């Protein structure tokens, strides 16, 4: 079991494809909680993921309920990245079995998902800034989680 990234009902294919490429390069899993705002596998998704999509481990869940059933059965902690988080991502103690959940680009996640999270983290931003692009935020959080857990590959570049 390894660190994983989950996208809650993603709106933008290119962001999801970019994150699929990131997890493929980092040896992680991507979970897509549907419905997505695009057909998974659409041209924008494939273009952003490039040929790395063949290497990506992507698991699709028909609903948040189905995702939660999987997560609880696996005994994994859900770490929600949110602008309402109380702990900065760099101050949070990640484990190698965490699932980091990113919300929809347009609306984040509903309150019920907030309540399901075991932890809520935030990327601190300058005053007046609302949020980062979800793909950038995901990459920053995964980088910190992998740094903390020693999860970066130790040999070569690919």
Curated annotation (Swiss-Prot):
InterPro entries: Alpha/beta_knot_MTases, SpoU_MeTrfase, TrmL, tRNA_m1G_MTases_N
Catalytic reaction equation(s): cytidine(34) in tRNA + S-adenosyl-L-methionine = 2'-O-methylcytidine(34) in tRNA + S-adenosyl-L-homocysteine + H(+); 5-carboxymethylaminomethyluridine(34) in tRNA(Leu) + S-adenosyl-L-methionine = 5-carboxymethylaminomethyl-2'-O-methyluridine(34) in tRNA(Leu) + S-adenosyl-L-homocysteine + H(+)
GO biological process, one term: wobble position ribose methylation
A Pfam family: SpoU_methylase
Source taxon at top rank: Bacteria
Alphabetic keyword roster: Cytoplasm, Methyltransferase, S-adenosyl-L-methionine, Transferase, tRNA processing
Any single GO CC term annotated in Swiss-Prot or TrEMBL for this entry: cytoplasm
Keyword S-adenosyl-L-methionine: yes
Enzyme nomenclature, EC number: 2.1.1.207
UniProt keyword Methyltransferase present: yes
Coiled-coil segments: none
Cellular compartments annotated: Cytoplasm
Major site of localization recorded for this protein: cytoplasm
EC class name: transferase
Binding annotation for S-adenosyl-L-methionine: 103, 123, 131
Any GO molecular function: tRNA (5-carboxymethylaminomethyluridine(34)-2'-O)-methyltransferase activity
Function of the molecule: Methylates the ribose at the nucleotide 34 wobble position in the two leucyl isoacceptors tRNA(Leu)(CmAA) and tRNA(Leu)(cmnm5UmAA). Catalyzes the methyl transfer from S-adenosyl-L-methionine to the 2'-OH of the wobble nucleotide.
Family: Belongs to the class IV-like SAM-binding methyltransferase superfamily. RNA methyltransferase TrmH family. TrmL subfamily.
Subunit structure: Homodimer.
Name under which the protein is recorded: tRNA (cytidine(34)-2'-O)-methyltransferase
Organism lineage string: Bacteria, Pseudomonadati, Pseudomonadota, Alphaproteobacteria, Hyphomicrobiales
């Amino acid at each position: 079991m390894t660190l994983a990234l989950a996208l809650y009902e993603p709106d933008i294919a290119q962001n999801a494809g970019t994150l699929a490429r990131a997890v493929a390069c980092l040896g992680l899993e991507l979970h897509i909680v549907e419905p997505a705002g695009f057909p998974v596998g659409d041209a924008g998704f494939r273009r952003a993921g490039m040929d790395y999509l063949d290497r990506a481990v992507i698991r699709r869940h028909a609903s948040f309920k189905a995702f939660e059933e999987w997560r609880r059965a696996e005994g994994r902690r859900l770490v929600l990245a949110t602008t309402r988080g109380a702990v900065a991502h760099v101050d949070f103690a990640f484990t190698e079995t965490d699932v980091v959940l990113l919300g929809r680009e347009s609306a984040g996640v509903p309150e019920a998902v907030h309540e399901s999270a075991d932890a809520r983290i935030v990327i601190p931003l300058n005053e007046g800034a609302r949020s980062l692009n979800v793909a950038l935020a995901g990459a920053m959080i995964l980088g910190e989680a992998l740094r903390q857990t020693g999860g970066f590959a130790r040999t070569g570049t690919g």
